[in-house]
């Protein structure tokens, strides 16, 4: 079984979000599971530099200009690169310029990614041809459409990491991307009078997966579907929509081997976590005190992530004696709000604006509770890292958060399945009640330790996801 992943980023070569973590880990897990998985990426500067053994496979003139297809390896995974400097050789973000404006030629930059993905199924590399083209998010969404236009030389799977990003472009670009105008249709890639790369993936793929079972159900409902509910309800009825939970890359995220921690630990040596907490308190300008619970946020600061709720609930958290360490960037209003809180409550609130992968490990190793109060969350990796590190997740019951965290209710504690704190409603009062439950459990150290051990024993390895995808691919053949 030969599978080509088509996507725009891959950790650690290039990362703007959780998609990169998935592509950095899933193909390697699939190879270990007996699937010949490779990855197709645009040759953005950081990616091109990272794949040092890239050799020329093919050269083509395309609707988006001349391209060179390269093939090399990274961490044991075969990587195809679309080398087109006029499209991809730009500093900074792969999606927008330094003023945060989307590049005006994104329609060509990402149509080309989908086109090359489909061409791979028609022999662009004469020595390797995928049985399944596995496409991720809107950037690669045209690949199933190009496959359909080609008579479907391979099966296709489209994975939705976040339905909110739809890849919308003006209709006149149908003239530029080498797809039949007949595809610009409600039964096709047309959405609200525009081309939607996301809808192309959803409509033309043989199967759609979402990154958690709950998110797969949620996206058939209007409040989560951004207008795609009709199509997604139809795919659900046809048995062509399912959820496969993301995993954790244990080579990178494991408190036992994590060299970024001051003190490594296991579920049997949890007392060694205390050193990480005091180091984190020092680094964040917090009062060093192992008796108070340290709550943490590692997140984009947006209302999707529910960070406005954290700001609203913060006085209540601090009144009970808690501390907050926050790492993130995003909405300027939220940034200002958290910086003001840090100034108002020195020693209790520490804020670092920005994102540093290494520091996120130190927070995960040192905090007691990780807050993930998202309004929607397709899968969420942060809470999985929290479980792995015995940093109990406090989450809203939505998407992947609902699938991965069990509340510390009395019955869950009795059944030995409790692993964190879960609240229902997207408001500060509901969040504060969950924070209150965290304080109650914190006052029972032996019970807290019991829940930490439960959390750390859970298996969210990529091997589980790799097996689910393999079974799906064979069903499609």
Swiss-Prot record:
Record-listed E.C. numbers: 2.4.1.21
CDD domains: GT5_Glycogen_synthase_DULL1-like
Keywords from the named record: Glycogen biosynthesis, Glycosyltransferase, Transferase
One Gene Ontology biological process: glycogen biosynthetic process
Record keyword Transferase present: yes
GO molecular function: alpha-1,4-glucan glucosyltransferase (ADP-glucose donor) activity; alpha-1,4-glucan glucosyltransferase (UDP-glucose donor) activity
Top enzyme category: transferase
Family per similarity comment: Belongs to the glycosyltransferase 1 family. Bacterial/plant glycogen synthase subfamily.
Residues bound to ADP-alpha-D-glucose: 15
Annotated function: Synthesizes alpha-1,4-glucan chains using ADP-glucose.
InterPro entries: Glyco_trans_1, GS/SS, Starch_synth_cat_dom
Protein name: Glycogen synthase
Gene Ontology CC annotations of this record: cytosol
Key word Nuclease present: no
Species of origin: Shigella flexneri
Species lineage: Bacteria, Pseudomonadati, Pseudomonadota, Gammaproteobacteria, Enterobacterales
Pathways per UniProt: Glycan biosynthesis; glycogen biosynthesis
Catalyzed reaction equations: [(1->4)-alpha-D-glucosyl](n) + ADP-alpha-D-glucose = [(1->4)-alpha-D-glucosyl](n+1) + ADP + H(+)
Superkingdom of source: Bacteria
């Amino acid at each position: 079984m030969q599978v080509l992943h088509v996507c725009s980023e891959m950790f650690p070569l290039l990362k703007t979000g959780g998609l990169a973590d998935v592509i950095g880990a899933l193909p390697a897990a699939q190879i270990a599971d007996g699937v010949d998985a490779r990855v197709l990426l645009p040759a953005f500067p950081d990616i091109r530099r990272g794949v040092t053994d890239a050799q020329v496979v093919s050269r083509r003139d395309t609707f988006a200009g001349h391209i060179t297809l390269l093939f090399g390896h990274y961490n044991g995974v075969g990587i195809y690169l679309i080398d087109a400097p006029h499209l991809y050789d730009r500093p900074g973000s792969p999606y927008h310029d330094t003023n945060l404006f989307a590049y005006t030629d994104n329609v060509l930059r990402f149509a080309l990614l989908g086109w090359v993905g489909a061409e791979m199924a028609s022999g662009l590399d004469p020595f390797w041809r995928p049985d399944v083209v596995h496409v991720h998010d809107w950037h690669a969404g045209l690949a199933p459409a190009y496959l359909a236009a080609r008579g479907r030389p391979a099966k296709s799977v489209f994975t939705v990491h976040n339905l909110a990003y739809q890849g919308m472009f003006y209709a006149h670009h149908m003239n530029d991307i080498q797809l039949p105008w007949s595809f610009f249709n409600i039964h096709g890639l047309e959405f609200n009078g525009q081309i939607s790369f996301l809808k192309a993936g959803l409509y033309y793929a043989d199967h759609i997966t979402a990154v958690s079972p709950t998110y797969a159900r949620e996206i058939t409902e209007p409040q989560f579907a951004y207008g795609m509910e009709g199509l997604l309800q139809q795919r659900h009825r046809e048995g062509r929509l399912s959820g496969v939970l993301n995993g954790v890359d244990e080579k990178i995220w494991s408190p036992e081997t994590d060299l970024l921690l001051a003190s490594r630990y296991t579920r049997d040596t949890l007392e060694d976590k205390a050193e990480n907490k005091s180091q984190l308190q020092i680094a964040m300008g917090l009062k060093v005190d192992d008796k108070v619970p340290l709550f943490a946020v590692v997140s984009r600061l947006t209302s999707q992530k529910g960070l406005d709720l954290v700001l609203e609930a913060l006085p209540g958290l601090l009144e009970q004696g808690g501390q907050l360490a926050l790492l993130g960037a995003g909405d300027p209003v939220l940034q200002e709000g958290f910086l003001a809180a840090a100034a108002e409550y020195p020693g209790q609130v520490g804020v670092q604006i920005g994102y540093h992968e290494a520091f996120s490990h130190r927070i995960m190793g040192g905090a007691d509770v990780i807050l993930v109060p998202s309004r929607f969350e397709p899968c969420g990796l942060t809470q999985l890292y929290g479980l792995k590190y015995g940093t109990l997740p406090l989450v809203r019951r939505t998407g992947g958060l609902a699938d991965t965290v069990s509340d510390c209710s009395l019955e869950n504690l009795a059944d030995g399945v409790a692993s964190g704190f879960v609240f229902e409603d997207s408001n500060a009062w509901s969040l504060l009640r969950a924070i209150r439950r965290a304080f109650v459990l914190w006052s029972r150290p032996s019970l807290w330790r019991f829940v930490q051990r439960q959390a750390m024993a859970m298996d969210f390895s990529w091997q589980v996801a790799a097996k689910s995808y393999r079974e799906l691919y064979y069903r499609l053949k």
